[in-house]
Every structure is written in C-alpha cells, then in structure tokens.
Amino acid sequence: MKILRKNHPLLKIINHSFIDLPTPSNISSWWNFGSLLGMCLMIQILTGLFLAMHYTSDTTTAFSSVAHICRDVNYGWLIRYLHANGASMFFICLFIHVGRGIYYGSYVLSETWNIGIILFLTTMATAFVGYVLPWGQMSFWGATVITNLLSAIPYIGSTLVEWIWGGFSVDKATLTRFFAFHFILPFIITAFVLVHLLFLHETGSNNPSGLNSNSDKIPFHPYYTIKDLLGILFLLTALMILALFFPDILGDPDNYTPANPLNTPAHIKPEWYFLFAYAILRSIPNKLGGVLALLLSILILMAFPLLNTSKQHGLIFRPITQTIYWILIANLLVLTWIGGQPVEYPFTMIGQIASITYFAIILILXPVSNTIENNIIKL
C-alpha cells in the first residue's frame, strides 16, 4: 500500500496533500479550522442536495415546499436545520480562520491569502442567495434591499438591478435564478478550495512562532489527521446541539411568515454573519458611499500583505499590535450588535464610530504600530 499511494497517479496527489505532507511540528488548534471548513462545505453540499430534491423554486410553492420538507419528508426537518445552522458554523469557522491568518501573519503567503478572500466573498454570495430561497418575509425583503444597492452604481445601476431581478421587482424569475446560483456556487467554492490548497502546499504552512520551520517538520498523517478528527467531533457536536435543541435561535421569526410584497417587516436585517458589514453599510448616509464601504470592509483584507511593514512575522512577540488586533475583534463584535439594532439614536452614532474605527485600525493604527515595534527592536 505504501508503494501504491506514492506511485499511483491519483493516490499520490492525495498522499502529497493529506498523508506525507511535511507540516510544522508546532501548529496549534487554531490551524484546525481549515479542515473544519472543508467538513462544513461537505455537510452543506450533502444536506443541500437532499433539500434540492424536494424544494421548488417557484414563488407560489417555495414557502410551502420548505414546510413540506420539514413535515412530510423523512428527517426533512433535520436536514433543513443542519443546512441552516451548518451555514452559521461555516461562518464561525471562516471568521476564526481569517482571524488566525491575521494574528499569525499568514497573509504574507499572498496567493493563498487572496484566493482565501475570493473564497470568503463567494461564500458570502452563496449564503445570501440561499437565504432568499425559503421565500419568507425576511428572505424577500432582504433580497429586495441588498439587490437594490446595485442601483447606486452610476449610469448602469437601475438597468443592472432589473437585469438581476429578471423583471421590475423581486419575483419568480429572481427566485429561480437565485436557486440556480445557490446550487452551482458551492461547486465553484470547492474548485477554489483546491486552488487555495495548491498555493498553500507550494509554500508550506505558516506556524505560531512565525519562524521558518523547514528544519522541523512532521508528516500530516497521523499527527494532524487525529487532531483534525477531534476538531470535527467538536464541530459536529456543536452543530447537532444547535440543530436538535435550538434550531431557530440564529434565524429570524419573520421568515416563518410567507413573503408579502405589500407588507414590510419592522426591521429588515440579514443573517447574523452579515451584520458587521450591514452596520458599515448603514452607517454612511450616502447610498453609493455605503455600498463602497460595504465592499471595502471585505476587500480591505487584500491590503494586509501590502500594509505589513513589520520585521517580525505574526503578532506573537508584538504586544502593541496584539492590543490593536483585539480592539479590532471587539470592534467587529460591536458592529455585529449594531447591525441587528433599529436605525435610531444612539445605535446610528455607535455604528458610525465603530465603522470609522474599523478602517482606522487597519489602515492607520496597525502600520503605525509596525513602525514603532520595528524601532523598538533597533534599541
């Protein structure tokens, strides 16, 4: 078997990626989230496939088809809630994965990092179109509000929105194409994941010390496969607790009301994992400015390799930047909270302060702290 896995054209690719892969001996549990994201993607594709077998992408039957899945299909309720809460677990792992990349300076592997950001954006797009499919109140109004943002683009905005809608409002054509997008995007994500891994295995993994680990590497299997299995066990336990005991805790009660274009919900808001970006969008009074800020809130991650001027790799020995990093995390939590609040004083003001702080930390404070720490090293 040893010879076969090293020489077989297909098996040797798997061997070099998951078995004999030289891995730093000191990577911590923060490195588990890559494999957990792979697990989440597999769960989402499988549960999604079974849901698609019973779902109908028609405005008159979409809502009742989801109810039919929960009531009449064997374990349909479980598949539906695993899929809905699986998306939340996916984003929790995604945020931690990106946060670890920032903390330990993984963004210096720029190709891997940039493909990762494209993956992040594609996952957000997939989650957005997926949220529209149950055709509840929040699905319909969320789709209307977010797609309407494109009308802020000068000259072509209105035409673009109508083109995406497939008519003059969010209707049957919109739902059908959103279902098509939601079905195809996970497979595009899978392709990007392979490219992400390809670039990662070209350079090798980063490690907590930030030092070159070529002199101290161990095979991925069995050391990290067993570690990943433990992580997967924790993830599945958390997902099952969510799906079985608190299936609706992260959802919106408005989505249990069928979509009605004549009745607007009191507070239109996306799923919890988009709230930070939604808060940044709402904090700017100008429509086009808000859309640009929304885009930049994610695309600014691409600037990390360019903004990094530190002589040290990662934040493990950099207390000033560490403090700024944790302020950034706290700031993102504040933005997430604000995104779910109504548009009124004092929430609007807190949102504006938190949005300015978010961009200031990344564009000003972090590069300044890098320079200060570089000068301290010289002392």
Curated annotation (Swiss-Prot):
Heme b b566 binds at residues 97, 196. InterPro entries: Cyt_b/b6_C, Cyt_b/b6_C_sf, Cyt_b/b6_N, Cytb/b6-like_sf, Cytochrome_b, Cytochrome_b_C_euk/bac, Cytochrome_b_N_euk/bac, Di-haem_cyt_TM. A ubiquinone binds at residue 201. The chain crosses the membrane at residues 33-53, 77-98, 113-133, 178-198, 226-246, 288-308, 320-340, 347-367. GO terms for cellular component: mitochondrial inner membrane; respiratory chain complex III. It is a multi-pass membrane protein. Coiled coil: none annotated. The cytochrome bc1 complex contains 11 subunits: 3 respiratory subunits (MT-CYB, CYC1 and UQCRFS1), 2 core proteins (UQCRC1 and UQCRC2) and 6 low-molecular weight proteins (UQCRH/QCR6, UQCRB/QCR7, UQCRQ/QCR8, UQCR10/QCR9, UQCR11/QCR10 and a cleavage product of UQCRFS1). This cytochrome bc1 complex then forms a dimer. This is Cytochrome b.
